[in-house]
């Protein structure tokens, strides 16, 4: 059994902020970009007030996320010590005293929730609910089969509603279904990849999630396919039914006199559907062929085809929703 050691030598205390930052998992902050989704699709991305308040909300949720990850590392200290990779984390490696880490995490959460209360009451409620959900997940829910992935999806849903509450935006049913389906797809895919790594490991019990032993491989495969399909179908319905944002005329409305009714402006988001379908298929390839997927945020940043499809999707969404805002007035008058 690995032994935990911590010393209070000067250099370790000097490096405390650095090790805390590593434990905070900045890469995981990518998940909090979900707060920007209502801002983008509401057509308010370039509204300075709403943009900066969403930025503030993003940093608050990133603080909460970091605090939760530090607490999680303290809870998982014993299992991390025998894990081939997790034992290198600062707390498990003895770089930070667990008590000090726990105190810092609690302080981070207190400051984050205090700042959340200054933005809006509903945002604060969402932040509190998210914090409670993540703590309960770390202590209990992640050990309950199926409930663990539903808790992960609920976290994304709370992020979206938190972002919507900041700008007083309406969130459509199909958009919510898209978020939930995609979150469940990523969570199930993560479990599928973790189980693949577990079965390929010579030591199948040390430092692993116990819940993985209760997930039949056939069940994970079925759920992966189910939520992969639900993700692109729900997004497709969202693009079919999404009305033009209230921020102003879309660039393609300018061509209304030259196009048949088949190409109404409210349907132009359909152009982005193929990129979403490709992204889903590429992620399935990563899970099954490359035997990866246990870290969705890492895959997004390292898999070039997937990253390219996401970037192209984002560019198209911005062009369709905000393109007319960047056309010179003379060109707009000419086209009209």
Role assignments for model-derived ranges:
Residues 33-37, 55-66, 103-114, 128, ...:
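Generic alpha-helical transmembrane segments of integral inner-membrane proteins
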């Amino acid at each position: 059994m690995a032994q935990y050691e911590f010393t209070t030598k000067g250099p370790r205390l000097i490096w405390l902020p650095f090790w805390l930052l590593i434990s905070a998992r900045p890469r995981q902050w990518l998940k909090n970009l979900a707060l920007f989704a209502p801002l983008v699709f509401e057509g308010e991305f370039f509204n300075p007030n709403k943009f900066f308040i969403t930025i503030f909300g993003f940093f608050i949720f990133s603080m909460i996320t970091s605090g939760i990850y530090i607490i999680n590392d303290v809870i998982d200290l014993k299992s991390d010590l025998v894990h081939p990779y997790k034992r290198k984390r600062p707390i498990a490696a003895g770089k930070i005293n667990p008590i000090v880490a726990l105190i810092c995490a609690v302080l981070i959460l207190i400051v984050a929730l205090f700042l959340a209360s200054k933005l809006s009451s509903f945002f604060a409620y969402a932040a509190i609910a998210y914090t409670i959900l993540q703590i309960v997940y770390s202590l209990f829910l992640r050990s309950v089969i199926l409930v663990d992935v539903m808790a992960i999806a609920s976290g994304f849903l709370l992020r979206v509603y938190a972002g919507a509450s900041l700008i007083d935006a309406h969130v459509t049913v199909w958009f919510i279904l898209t978020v939930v389906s995609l979150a469940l797809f990523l969570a199930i895919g993560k479990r599928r990849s973790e189980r693949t790594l577990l079965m390929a490991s010579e030591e199948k019990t040390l430092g692993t999630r116990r819940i993985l032993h209760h997930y039949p491989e056939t069940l994970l495969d079925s759920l992966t396919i189910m939520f992969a399909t639900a993700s692109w179908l729900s997004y497709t319905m969202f693009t079919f039914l999404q009305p033009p944002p209230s921020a102003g005329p879309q660039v393609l409305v300018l061509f209304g006199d030259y196009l048949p009714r088949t190409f109404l402006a409210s349907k132009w988001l359909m152009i982005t559907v193929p990129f979403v379908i490709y992204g889903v298929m590429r992620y399935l390839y990563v899970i099954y062929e490359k035997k990866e997927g246990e870290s969705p945020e890492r895959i997004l940043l390292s898999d070039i085809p997937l990253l390219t499809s996401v970037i192209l999707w984002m560019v198209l969404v911005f062009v369709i929703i905000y393109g007319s805002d960047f056309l010179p007035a003379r060109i707009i008058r000419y086209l009209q």
